[in-house]
A protein has these predicted regions:
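Glycine-centered tight turns that cap/initiate beta-strands
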Residues: 17, 83, 123, 181-184
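AMP-binding/adenylate-forming catalytic core of the ANL superfamily
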Residues: 110, 115-116, 126, 134, ...
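Gly/Ser/Thr-rich phosphate-binding loop
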Residues: 3-72, 85, 93
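Conserved ATP/PPi-binding loop(s) of AMP-dependent carboxylate-activating enzymes
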Residues: 79-83, 94-128, 167
Length: 193
């Protein structure tokens, strides 16, 4: 939202004490990432764009501050943290080729993992562990590029069905905010009666 207001507002503040920038919650658009890095971080602060869920108990994908030898890519959450084995798979659980959209899964249990849902162990196993054998199903779309970097593409269940096509809400939101007259957008489906 700051980006659409121009550079004057952030440039009117002394941001020299910043050492690290963070973003979490939704995939970050590469253009926004570049602006954030240049204008807010003054091209000196790494951006820690993390992926995690409450159920994972902590960050699963994140650039690690202090490891500047791993270059950042605008819009990518980078790589799994050490010890986390992530894959991007198709609907049958087969790993997809690089640069192909698929489901983000975690192959093995890890410290901090949610062990059950309060009062509903069956739902926990059904929602998170039954779609792919012995793998945690995140419910998110992602792709892995040729360098192994992960690009989060939004929720798999956050999809609109329009004229026989499945379109992700995050894709529409990115398209809408590409218009200079739009600061923010949120897309949600409504039933077609």
């Amino acid at each position: 939202m700051f980006m659409k207001s121009g550079d004057d507002i952030p440039n009117s503040f002394d941001l020299s004490s910043l050492r690290l920038l963070g973003t979490v919650g939704e995939p970050i658009n590469p253009e926004v990432w570049k602006w954030y890095y240049k204008i807010i971080g003054k091209e000196k602060c790494p951006i820690v764009d993390t992926w995690w869920q409450t159920e994972t108990g902590g960050m699963m994908i994140s650039p690690l501050p202090g490891l500047e030898t791993i270059p950042l890519k605008p819009g990518s959450a980078t790589l799994p943290v050490p010890g986390i084995d992530i894959a991007v798979v198709d609907e049958f659980g087969v790993e997809v080729p690089s640069n192909t959209k698929g489901y983000l899964i975690i192959k093995n249990p890890w410290p901090g993992i949610l062990l059950t849902l309060w009062g509903d162990d069956k739902k926990y196993k059904t929602v998170y562990w039954s779609k792919y054998t012995n793998c945690y199903y995140s419910g998110d779309y992602a792709l892995r590029d040729n360098d192994g970097y992960l690009w989060l593409l939004g929720r798999a269940d956050d999809v609109l069905k329009i004229a026989g096509h499945r379109i992700g809400t995050a894709e529409l939101e990115s398209c809408i905010v590409s218009d200079d007259n739009v600061a923010e957008s949120a897309v949600c489906g409504i039933p077609d009666e």
